[in-house]
């Protein structure tokens, strides 16, 4: 490996860490400010009613769920809708970390039904211009990825 290749790999890894941290920060802030829609069905309803308020769509799935055909069909339809409406999309793995970030109860309790975390929408109502460093960082990453012909960039949330 040449020095240039090593530097490029290091920069890519650092960029991925920055974007992952930005997504985590954005999700926590969006939930705190009631700007987060959780669930495939709820997200589809919101995008049908007010697609202009959606600024980011996160599609979350872990490797063991990749064979879920129904979920993949939902993702395909949501991705298509997002592309038609210029909504940034990011694929995310690490459902356990996602649940942890959103304060979901642990699976071991079993008494409460867990929310569907496979699709998350971050909204920005028309009435105010909410600016979040995390949102700017993620939007920049999405734009950069599209420039590299990666239409739906991927990040992995790591457990802590």
Swiss-Prot record:
Pfam families: Ribosomal_L7Ae. The keyword Oxidoreductase does not apply. GO terms for cellular component: cytoplasm; nucleus. It comes from the Eukaryota. Keywords: Apoptosis, Developmental protein, Differentiation. Involved in the regulation of growth and apoptosis. Mediates activation of stress-responsive MTK1/MEKK4 MAPKKK. Interacts with GADD45GIP1. This is Growth arrest and DNA damage-inducible protein GADD45 beta. It comes from Homo sapiens (Human).
């Amino acid at each position: 490996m040449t020095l240039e290749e090593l530097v490029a790999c290091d920069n890519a890894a650092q960029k991925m860490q920055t974007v992952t941290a930005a997504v985590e920060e954005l999700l926590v802030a969006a939930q705190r400010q009631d700007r987060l829609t959780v669930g495939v069905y709820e997200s589809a309803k919101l995008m049908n009613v007010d697609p202009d308020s959606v600024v980011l769509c996160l599609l979350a799935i872990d490797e063991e769920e990749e064979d879920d055909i129904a979920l993949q069909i939902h993702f395909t339809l949501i991705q298509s809708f997002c592309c038609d409406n210029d909504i940034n999309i990011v694929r995310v793995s690490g459902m356990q970390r996602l649940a942890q970030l959103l304060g979901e109860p642990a699976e071991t309790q079993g008494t409460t039904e867990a929310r569907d975390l496979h699709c998350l929408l971050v909204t920005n109502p028309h009435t105010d211009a909410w600016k979040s460093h995390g949102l700017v960082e993620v939007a920049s990453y999405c734009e950069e990825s599209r420039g590299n012909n990666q239409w739906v960039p991927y990040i992995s949330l790591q457990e802590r």
